[in-house]
Amino acid sequence: MEGLVTLILAAGLGKRMKSKHPKVVHKVCGKPMIEWVVDAVEEIGSKEVIVVVGHKAEEVKEVLKERVKYAYQEVQLGTGHAVMMAEDLLPEEGNVLILTGDTPLITSNTLKELINFHIKEGNSVTILSSVLEDPTGYGRIIRDKSGNVIRIVEDKDATEEEKSIHEINSAMYVMDIAKLKKALRMITNNNAQGEYYLTDAVEIIRDMDGKIGAFTVPSEEITGVNSRVQLFEAEKIMRKRINYRHMENGVTIVDPDTTYIGAEVEIGADTVVLPGCVIEGKTKIGSDCEIGPNCRIVDSEIGDGCSVTYSVILSSKIKNNVKIGPFAHIRPETVIQSNVKIGDFVEIKKSIIDEGSKVPHLTYVGDAEVGKNVNMGCGSITVNYDGKQKHKTVIGDNVFVGCNVNLVAPVKIGNNAYIAAGSTITEDVPEGALAIARSRQTNKEGWVQERIKKGRL
């Protein structure tokens, strides 16, 4: 919105979180709380965003980097004091949207409606309010007999009569900047907490003949996060929003209550997500896939028509029509091309598996290039580590690797080669060759009976 400046208060200690980290960097559905707020503000086109930081400021700056400007509140002396610390960064006129960094559930639609209401009503201050069944802990909106807002009283300073009011202050506002700057010079810390309340500025602006209004929204959006329990509650609401959005876009989520999908995940239409899945980071999943049950996928790309069952995929790329699992572990920097099968109890690490190949079960492939239409037998492994360094295995196209084979890297297997079961391969295998590297079998007939006679069995 043209000319709008946003001020986000994020300097609090967050003592109830019992954490060494600032409250606002704790994550909701994989994204720091403060980032949810900044995202919502950017969606409405705020001209400038200023964040007031204090406690562990560097951690907040590490999250937001250069997306915003910063003001510093070295000592936490209340919300009014926090705004004072940013006063020099505010223009002389216009409107400022004041938000808190611990309200990740606020949406851009609500902010647009709040600002439009403020402008339409010609208010000097518009308070974002809500009606709570239990308003304990929140400041109350005090209205006169005509319903006009006259002031806000903090919970700790409220009388018993005022505490019976259920309309609460969310600590989010739109304010006329010129009037706000005048009011900041007049507020005092003469209250139970010895702090400078921004709420006092509301009453001062009213006394300047400024019009005060309140825009009421559902309580869900203004919920602040002050403890781990409230973090869980916010997470639950956000997870429901995310899951419902995917379902509305054509994704089947069989049990949304047991499905965790991060904020930045993309999923194509007609994909089915079964119970117990955790899909995080910047993961992209194509159409017509079946994911789960009980999978974890992080920062990975999965193409169309794939099946992933009881498996973990980390920072990897999976092309189309790939079957993975059950109980496979795809580790970072792996690329699996189309029409590949990765079966049960298989681990793939930093490797390329080319089209049409099969790694069906009980196999480790690390630091390897596996060609097209390769079959890796049960129990086959690439021996990639010599105790100091990792080494590469290269397997050509149409190679058959028998069961219980060790490929000791660095080693190359030529196209169309066969590796006999039980072999430990330490040298390159030529194209089209059969490699056998195992001891000959020796049968000692009558050995068992002889041992029995001697009392040794």
Curated annotation (Swiss-Prot):
Binding site for UDP-N-acetyl-alpha-D-glucosamine: 9-12, 23, 73, 78-79, 139, 154, 169, 226, 331, 349, 364, 375
Active site: H361
Region (N-acetyltransferase) residue spans: 250-457
UniProt KW keywords: Acyltransferase, Cell shape, Cell wall biogenesis/degradation, Cytoplasm, Magnesium, Metal-binding, Multifunctional enzyme, Nucleotidyltransferase, Peptidoglycan synthesis, Repeat, Transferase
UniProt cross-references to CDD domains, sorted A to Z: GT2_GlmU_N_bac (cd02540), LbH_GlmU_C (cd03353)
A Gene Ontology BP annotation from the UniProt entry: cell morphogenesis
EC number(s) recorded for this UniProt protein: 2.7.7.23, 2.3.1.157
Protein name per Swiss-Prot or TrEMBL: Bifunctional protein GlmU
Organism encoding this protein: Thermoanaerobacter pseudethanolicus (strain ATCC 33223 / 39E) (Clostridium thermohydrosulfuricum)
Gene name for this UniProt entry: glmU
